[in-house]
A protein has these predicted regions:
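A short beta-strand-turn-helix
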Residues: 61-80
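Typically the conserved alpha-helix immediately C-terminal to a functionally engaged Cys/Sec
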Residues: 93-108
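Thioredoxin-like thiol-disulfide oxidoreductase module
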Residues: 110-162, 166-173
Length: 185
């Protein structure tokens, strides 16, 4: 009986060696394919990002601009949306482009909000402004949205991930978000 057991173990080891050799040989091609796919995806994202409008201004005084928007919001009876992110962030640029090129969403924003692209980048992290709004990017990533009332009071912070659909955004989810915090119905 012990010789049978030893033979069984030896056969298992022998077949393991063959399968390991095969796996090691086969693993090279998929790794090369994966690297090529990753490089192609990176290039496609870079090309897409290059074509999209760049709404964030790293040199702008965000604190002063938001103060101006609060005054304007009172006069126009609108809330404010701060879209936090940067020109480095493809999802930030996609969201901006999505809203600007979707007439229904653009109309909701134009009718109900003053919209500001709050820059977060290596050049200008706007740390003081972000701290005032509880550093939403640390919690949710970018883009992240902060809704302010006409007095500048924070009403809501919106994670953008729940608005995504595929490689873009859901019109219905974004519309629902915009309408929920709108000043007018």
């Amino acid at each position: 009986m012990s010789s049978l057991l030893i033979t069984g173990v030896a056969c298992a080891q022998k077949s393991d060696v063959k399968s390991t050799d095969k796996v090691a040989t086969d693993a090279v091609a998929p790794e090369q394919d994966s690297a090529a796919i990753a490089a192609a995806k990176k290039k496609a994202a870079s090309d897409e990002k290059a074509k999209l409008p760049k709404p964030y201004n790293a040199e702008e005084n965000a604190e002063a601009r938001i103060a101006e928007l609060v005054k304007q919001a009172k006069a126009e009876n609108k809330n404010i949306i701060l879209q936090a992110g940067g020109n480095w962030c493809i999802w930030c640029l996609r969201f901006n482009n999505f809203v600007q090129t979707t007439p229904e969403l653009k109309q909701i924003v134009d009718d109900n909000y003053l919209y500001y692209h709050l820059n977060y980048s290596p050049e200008n992290k706007n740390a003081k402004v972000f701290a005032k709004y509880e550093n939403p990017g640390d919690k949710f990533g970018y883009p992240v949205f902060v809704v302010l009332d006409q007095n500048g009071k924070m009403l809501h912070t919106q994670d953008s991930a729940v608005l995504e659909e595929g490689k873009g955004y859901s019109t219905e989810k974004v519309k629902e978000f915009f309408l929920k915090w709108a000043t007018k119905s």
